[in-house]
Amino acid sequence: MSGPVTEAARAKINLTLRVLGKRADGYHELQSLVVFAQSGDRLTAREADELRLDVAGRFAAALQGEPDNLVLRAARMLREETGIKSGAHLTLEKNLPVASGIGGGSADAAAALRALTALWGVAPGDEVLSRIAAALGADVLVCLHSRTAMMWGKGEKIMPLADLPRFWLVLANAGIALSTAAVFRELAAAPLAAAPSDPAPVPPGTLDDLAAWLAAEGNDLEPPALTLAPEIGETISALALTAGCLLARMSGSGATCFGLYAAEEEAREAALVLQAAHPGWWLEVSAAGG
């Protein structure tokens, strides 16, 4: 009998997100610089005869009654690819807001793949895991390794980055859930006119240099998300007004936003100020980068 295996499902933050156009296959051509927070969900896998999933934690209620879940889909696909007959009792501690632009479901699915390969003692290899991840969703592959990276294409092209300056993030969500599909519909991206080139490298330099580059790159999903949920603008403004904030922006398709800070003390003070002014908000502080 193998003991339980627990994996962290860390929040994915899109520091930049460019939508270059809609591809012929229906997917959008993207370029995004992503980092991973220290906070996130937790997934535990235990031996069992059948596959089953229990969800607990602050945001568990948002997943109750789902007929299918990315975690279970990941487990079934891994079992099919490896031919394993074992089951597993999966417990997901849901600490991240649902439908919030920080890759929670994708990170959970990736954590399930990591946990179950260990629990079942299988080694499907990178090619198989990448194929499963791509079938589950555009963000699952980058969440498998949960490392700072530039990702592009529909999420299948990933270049790890190890030399970003270290910084601190305050993550803030005012209790808004946004459908990724709805945000893309509102964006109404034009068809991709030509095969895009690879993204330009992140220029080396100081944290101030990085913040200036991030500001210029932007998040193309922020305007359509603001149209659907104007309250996101209030979250961004509140972050931007905190002392030491170098950049305030929405992550992914929203509605979670982040503030970027040079020092831990600045980030923690900002979170305290925001919590006092907005006691209902979800707030997390995390290091990222270097």
Curated annotation (Swiss-Prot):
Q: Which residues form the active site?
A: 12, 139
**One example GO MF annotation:** ATP binding
Give the record's GO biological process terms: isopentenyl diphosphate biosynthetic process, methylerythritol 4-phosphate pathway; terpenoid biosynthetic process
Q: Which SUPFAM superfamilies match?
A: GHMP Kinase, C-terminal domain, Ribosomal protein S5 domain 2-like
- Pathway(s) annotated for this protein in UniProt: Isoprenoid biosynthesis; isopentenyl diphosphate biosynthesis via DXP pathway; isopentenyl diphosphate from 1-deoxy-D-xylulose 5-phosphate: step 3/6
Q: Which PANTHER family match?
A: 4-DIPHOSPHOCYTIDYL-2-C-METHYL-D-ERYTHRITOL KINASE, CHLOROPLASTIC (PTHR43527:SF2)
Q: What does this protein do?
A: Catalyzes the phosphorylation of the position 2 hydroxy group of 4-diphosphocytidyl-2C-methyl-D-erythritol.
Q: Which family does it belong to?
A: Belongs to the GHMP kinase family. IspE subfamily.
Spell out the protein name for this chain: 4-diphosphocytidyl-2-C-methyl-D-erythritol kinase
Q: Which organism is it from?
A: Parvibaculum lavamentivorans (strain DS-1 / DSM 13023 / NCIMB 13966)
The encoding gene is: ispE
